[in-house]
Amino acid sequence: MTRVLILSWEYPPLIEGGLARHVRKLSEALVERDVEVHVLTRGGEESPAEERRGGVVIHRIREPKRPTDLGEFVAWVERMNSDMLAAGVELGDRYSFDLVHGHDWLVANACDHLAKRFDAPLVTTIHATEHGRHQGWVDKHPQTYIHGVERWITNRSDRVIACSHYMREQIADIFGVDEGRVSVIPNGIDPDDLQPQDEEELTRLRSEFAAPEEKLVLLIGRLVYEKGFQLALEAMPRLIEEVPGTRFLIAGSGTHEAELHKQAEELGLMEHGTFLGWIGDDVLHSLYKIADLTVVPSIYEPFGLVALEAMASGCPCIVADTGGLREVVPHEEVGLRFPARDPEALAEVAIRVLSDDELGRNLVAEAYEHLRRFDWGDVAEQTAEVYAGLVGEASRA
């Protein structure tokens, strides 16, 4: 049985974004495939230093005090890595790890040192790049530092995992990594998380945001520039004019939140929608079921999990024609795409779906088979194959 140490800066119940959910689902699915999984992460005082959950052994360091100044974030990450390294060394004395698997730049330093100490292969999953998040502008701190760490760790790793072919090309081009060392393994979804819920409760929830005869447009994600919510707001006046009674619902939080509120006020949209802020998974999954349309207007998108979850929940979706969204949403098959950064095109496609209920139903129906590609079992199987190949190579060396 392969024993792997996975490092992630977040893991439930500590959730910053999608990474925590991804690592948990992957870890638990790997356990079902006879991989012994240990996760090294951070946690608050309320979380146990060590526990077994879903078959995964979770080890937590106490979280260093979080800085309020973004400029101090890099130093905070370095302290976290130092603490993780110390904890990882102790774990290495207790267990014999066959492989180290790190997620993103935030744990790169600790991963590299631990892999060398254990004389074990190193796998790194790159979920997004700083270069992509900032459209290539990485000449200022902390972007320069983060970009440098990403380049360094991808070239140090024995194998890099990317969530889409788009990301594999980006990693190869930006960091100079041989594409042969980059495995494409998509993110997964768990249909059980998206099962139908009490209809009365869903009706009550929808009534908080829209009347029965109105159309509800949903946007979910971190409120940051690269997610493109500002483009969706720019498209809303025309959408409301063409499809009277259209309302929007934005769920998420982030550094761009105040600007989006200001933009909505300037466009006269505040009476036509709601900013929900950060929400938990239970509410998140319900929102897909009460919406008439999910919009993913990203400027930069390595994968596109929101689109997958929307389709799996029976909600039609339209997405920007960019990045991994091209692979997740085949155009005119399971969803519709519009040119990225084009609010007019976004409005036109949204109007088309909201004005044609049959089109929406057909898109959702066609998505059923497509979604089978993203089952967590398959994702874990592909990951376990990467592990087995590297461990086998190491044993023969």
Regions found by a protein language model. Give the residues of each.
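N-terminal subdomain of nucleotide-sugar transferases
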Residues: M1-V57, S395-R396
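A short helix/loop element that forms part of the nucleotide-sugar donor recognition site in Leloir-type
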Residues: H141, Q195-A210
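Carbohydrate-associated surface elements
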Residues: Y166, G188
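Short alpha-helical donor nucleotide-sugar binding micro-motif in glycosyltransferases
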Residues: W278-I279, S286-A291
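Aromatic "clamp/platform" in nucleotide-sugar-dependent glycosyltransferases that forms part
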Residues: I299
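Short hydrophobic beta-strand element within catalytic cores of glycosyltransferases
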Residues: P316-A320
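Conserved acidic donor-binding segment of nucleotide-sugar-dependent glycosyltransferases
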Residues: H331-E332, L336-P343, R352-D357
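A short, well-ordered alpha-helix in the C-terminal region of glycosyltransferases
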Residues: A345, R352, L359-R373, A384-E385
